[in-house]
Amino acid sequence: MDRDSPFADPDRSDPLPAPSNTLKASIFAQSRIVHPSTSVYNQFGRHRHDDIGQESFHEGIQPSVASLANLQGSYTAKSIHPHHSAIGLRNSSYDDHGDDADEQDPEDLLSDEELGLIAGDARNPSASLSYASNRSRKRRTNPSDPRSRASAVGGLSAKQKALWMWANVDNLDAFLQEVYAYYVGRGAICIALSRSLNLLTVAFVICFSTFLFGCIDYSSIRHDGQLSDVIVGHCVAGFSPFATLVVVLLLAAFGWQAVQFVLGLSRLRAMHRFYEQLLGIPDADVQSIPWHEVVNRLSALRDQHPTTSLSSADEMELGQRTSSSLRRSHPQPLDAHDVANRIMRQENYLIALFNENILDLSVPGLRSRSPSLTRSLEWNLHFCLLGFLFDSNGQVRHAFLSERYRADLIEGLRRRFLFMAVVNAIFAPFIVLYLLLYSFFRYFEEYHKDPSNLGSRQYTQYARWKFREFNELPHLFRRRCRTSYVAASKYMDQFPKEKTAIVARFVAFVAGSFTAVLLLASVMDPDVFVHFNITPQRNVLFYIGVFGAILAVARGMIPDEHVVFEPEAMLREVIEQTHYLPQDWKGRFHSAQVHQAFGQLYTLKIYIFLQELLSVVTTPFVLWLSLPACAPDLIDFLRKYTVHVDGLGHVCSFAVFDFARQPTASTMGGAAAKGIHRQQQQQQQQQQQSGGSGRTRAPRNGMSQAKMEQSILGFRANHPDWDPAAHASTASIQRVDDDAGATTLQYGHGDGRSTSDAPTGVGAGAKVKDLIDHIYRGSGGAAGASRW
């Protein structure tokens, strides 16, 4: 490799092959993990089937296949965020002018070899094929070519169109994200219906709010009047310049969303064909089929048609091409781990950053300086950090992998934070106004119907990122959080509040006494109920309502006498589901400090809503004052914990379950674990002695809830068909198993403990063996108390 490449290691020459009889050589011979600093990359990768137009130049091709030579174009979708999918929003890269009612099977028209060509399995490439590919690329960029893509695709059956789309996937990350978004959206009909109704909701909020605030003369309202008497004619013409600007901006945003929705319908239709024709999943079954079954069918499709126009991650990043013999002999499989890594390539970095406490999300000037994450701040993090780290193809930029660009990257990241701080400050009034209007229409009916929902709780955005595990897809994470809600609510309610209960009993007694007297007086003389005023303009009915409300609130604060208080048991049940157990919680489940700390993670919905509104004002300060100071640590972390996986590209090293690179205390020997623990205590003492204010960062590679061990166990539970032994991480685990000292890990209640007096020799690495035993004993169900 060129020494000037950002991937090259300037301090080492070309590596010499290690003896094949060593354990280290056997491990890395099986592993696909290559760190960016390594100067030699595995050349076995998928080749790119550049254009399906090659097929017309292949020997012996039949006339029926020759018609497919006119198919131009490729699937070139950009990288798509899973929570903002491009299905139904982005413009389609192909048109659907064909008749989907054509039920003729492509196997009736094409031979097996020709079907392999359609799916990208081109055999024996020659110079003529290369020439044809170049010629087809030129035709693809020429809009005046009569053999356009739309006319060519229009003559195919539904299954042939699906095969053509699969054969021309250029960006596998974006394609898999659309496949996942289609699954989460519950099929084409549900996605189209949901997005169309969302558009109508936005239109209703804009129109109804404009009518209420600008088209009604509230001073003319009378008890005996009519609606027509208070409506202002031509009210829009009388708007102030600011009100007109707000309406124009809202209408422009609505129009943009409507155009994107219409243009994305063709892609939604194409994804419907892909599910139905190639994966064999009709729209009615998308709502009930488990995700791991969808992944199995994707893997089977990849095994059947291993070579598409998809370029491997190596080719995309390095511009390299491998020989056709290597391509045919080393097809790259697509397993559940690869699918999850591609879908969550960006989110895995955020999970790692929150797990390592690198981001300073505190509002400057506040005394507590506790981290506060809202949806608006989360969106800004995606734009500033992930938008800077990844290019337009969804791949890590090369500059982040070399230390020589460190200063430029730090300065660039700081500028992005400062720029977005200014943008957020400018648009803050519009965002607050829209949030207030939308939330009022959205939640008023819910709380009016059931006022008790005002006291309901949910996890904060910060808690969700702390709980989430590597390669855990959003729908699986939501399911895990929902299973903990009952226990979490019981823990918050059952925690003894004797002081509050004593005061509540007194308030309930006083309010109940007043209510009883007023009700008794109303029964004895019904006229008193309405006509007798206790205070000016306030009759008996009014005060019965006031004291009744106070009585209801006070009774709600008094615990049931028959309830058995078990806060420790409830918190343990929560930990079994959330897999979150900080070090300072252990042995203190009964304490008020732990109850308060958990209450900050599982807080009232009304508080979260107020925090979202307030964050519109505080986000510019966080972006301007707090986050720029984190830029050096962020750049260093991204460079250090980015690895290269053949066929997958650059990903977060935590997401590949590379225990050899991130040795936590639970994967190391007892002595090593104690060394890490001592290092933690020393750093904490130094921070206390220096009186350091602001954020406190947990030591890297320390005992931070054994995040990777939890992730691999949870991933195995959610994907029962995934074989860890066939994955590269198994080699890393095996190396730790041979080299590490004796250690044990207890998964009950998520409490990991390392011991130094465990047996050695044959019993060395007992933790890793225990981890593997847990994986292979798993039944495939959701992770529960038996594993955690």
UniProtKB/Swiss-Prot annotation:
Q: Which domain of life does this protein belong to? A: Eukaryota
> Which regions are flagged for Polar residues bias?
125-134
Q: Where is the composition biased (Acidic residues)?
A: 97-108
Q: What is its main location?
A: membrane
Q: How is it placed in the membrane, per its record?
A: Multi-pass membrane protein
Spell out the Low complexity composition-biased ranges.
Answer: 679-689
Protein species of origin: Mycosarcoma maydis
Disulfide bonds, which pairs? none
Description of its domains: Forms a homotrimer with a solvated central pore, which is connected laterally to the cytosol through the cavity within each protomer. Acts as a lipid scramblase that uses its central pore to function: the central pore opens laterally to accommodate lipid headgroups, thereby enabling lipid flipping and redistribution of lipids added to the outer leaflet of ATG9-containing vesicles, thereby enabling growth into autophagosomes.
Region Disordered: start and end of each range? 1-22, 87-108, 124-153, 307-332, 668-706, 742-762
Compartments where found: Preautophagosomal structure membrane; Cytoplasmic vesicle membrane; Golgi apparatus membrane; Endoplasmic reticulum membrane
UniProt biased composition (Basic and acidic residues): 1-14
Q: Which UniProt keywords apply?
A: Autophagy, Cytoplasmic vesicle, Endoplasmic reticulum, Golgi apparatus, Lipid transport, Membrane, Transmembrane, Transmembrane helix, Transport
Q: Which family does it belong to?
A: Belongs to the ATG9 family.
- Enumerate the intramembrane stretches of this chain: 417-437, 606-626
Q: Which PANTHER family match?
A: APG9 AUTOPHAGY 9, AUTOPHAGY-RELATED PROTEIN 9
TM ranges are 196-216, 236-256, 501-521, 539-559
PTM text = Phosphorylated by ATG1. ATG1 phosphorylation is required for preautophagosome elongation.
> For side Cytoplasmic, which residue ranges?
1-195, 257-416, 438-500, 560-605, 627-788
UniProt-recorded name of the protein: Autophagy-related protein 9
Topology check: give the Lumenal ranges.
217-235, 522-538
Give the GO cellular component terms, alphabetically.
autophagosome; cytoplasmic vesicle membrane; endoplasmic reticulum membrane; Golgi membrane; phagophore assembly site; phagophore assembly site membrane
Quaternary assembly? Homotrimer; forms a homotrimer with a central pore that forms a path between the two membrane leaflets.
Query: Which catalytic reaction applies to this protein?
Result: a 1,2-diacyl-sn-glycero-3-phosphocholine(in) = a 1,2-diacyl-sn-glycero-3-phosphocholine(out); a 1,2-diacyl-sn-glycero-3-phospho-L-serine(in) = a 1,2-diacyl-sn-glycero-3-phospho-L-serine(out); a 1,2-diacyl-sn-glycero-3-phosphoethanolamine(in) = a 1,2-diacyl-sn-glycero-3-phosphoethanolamine(out); a 1,2-diacyl-sn-glycero-3-phospho-(1D-myo-inositol-3-phosphate)(in) = a 1,2-diacyl-sn-glycero-3-phospho-(1D-myo-inositol-3-phosphate)(out)
**Cited function:** Phospholipid scramblase involved in autophagy and cytoplasm to vacuole transport (Cvt) vesicle formation. Cycles between the preautophagosomal structure/phagophore assembly site (PAS) and the cytoplasmic vesicle pool and supplies membrane for the growing autophagosome. Lipid scramblase activity plays a key role in preautophagosomal structure/phagophore assembly by distributing the phospholipids that arrive through ATG2 from the cytoplasmic to the luminal leaflet of the bilayer, thereby driving autophagosomal membrane expansion. Required for mitophagy.
**A single GO BP:** piecemeal microautophagy of the nucleus
